[in-house]
Amino acid sequence: MYKILIVEDDETIRNGIKTLLELQGYYVDIAVNGVDGLKKFDETYSLVIMDIIMPLLSGIDACKKLREESSVPILFLTAKSSEIDIMQGFEVGGDDYLVKPFSNMELISRVKALLRRRNVYDREIIDDNAGNEYIDRKD
């Protein structure tokens, strides 16, 4: 079962996303800000969904700290919608960026896509550790 951490300071949004993802069969933990998210994070999470504008520690700063120790996919979910904001989200290590308000279908689609990419990455690591050889194909 996939384990997802939601880092969001708005209780209504946090609980709505939690319920939506649980109905899809995911195990979901919540954190109320960036500091809380960093305390709760461990490598058993398959995905982190994170707001950017939060008290104590922004999502941007929390992402920077997570990237020092982990490659877990991070989906920013935020009201910040300028091109500069989006670019900054990717530059600090975010894997996807969704602007509020968002549709439930779009969120679920992006979560599934990030988890599929994570599965491919994890399989490649396992295969590589098993000593399998890869052929680099250049089209």
Give the role of each language-model region.
Residues 3, 113-139:
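Short, Lys/Arg-enriched segments at the junction into DNA-binding effector domains
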Residues 82, 102-115:
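C-terminal output helix
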Residues 52-55, 81:
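Receiver (REC) domain active-site loop signature in two-component systems and cognate sites
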Residues 30-47:
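Acidic, metal-coordinating helix/loop segments flanking the phosphotransfer/catalytic sites
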